[in-house]
Amino acid sequence: QLAARWLLNIGFITIGGYPDQVPEAYLIPPSAFESDESIPRFDNIAPHLGIDTFDLSGGAIADDFDNDGYLDLVESTWDPNGQMRFFRNNRDGTFTDQTQQAGLEGLLGGLNLVQADYDNDSYVDVLVLRGAWMGEHGQHPNSLLRNNGDGTFSDVTFDVGLGDEHYPTQTASWADYDNDGDLDLYVGNEWTASLQAPSQLFRNNNDGTFTDVAVNAGVTNERFTKAVIWGDYDDDRFPDLFVSNLGQ
């Protein structure tokens, strides 16, 4: 019975109904969750900063997109029909929603966001990843959003060679794996028996376009990829690739 009471209370916590909506006979009082130690609490200040949004959790980036020395915010949602948003830092601790002004209106979904200056123009660009967990229904194009340096972004996905294949993914990582001075991109895709979705290694061609060289590099990783990251673990100045797969 104690386990059932615990789960019932947790259920009400997840839907915001604890403790008021829990039947009195089954209520575990808030005092039971108190600690002997004084633990500081975080207050939700988002409403006061202009960034109070409610949606299915997606990706988030805090970076200086306009090079003014202040961190701006970009957020997305797992909802395929949900609008991603761009919040510009007002330099006073608050933010203004500049989604429409930035040219991002109509860009939907995105379970994850990964930023990088892929074209070496000193402005941070954004990669939007889509389709994860949706299997055959998750073959949505990702979006590479080029920062134009004037407060706007342009979707250049197909122009730069990233839009030829659409696989479900939620993970990618940037690094200059060939040490030629520009960033390359590894995208980890979700391979299943019903949907063959090899991971992709996009080599930067030094002209703002990319070529998928995963087959030649031996990194197609025909598995259900959940996370990828570059790092030079052996200090040879060449980035190495770590891939995490579901159930393997």
Model feature map: region roles:
Residues 1-248:
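Acidic, glycine/proline-rich Ca2+-coordinating loop motifs
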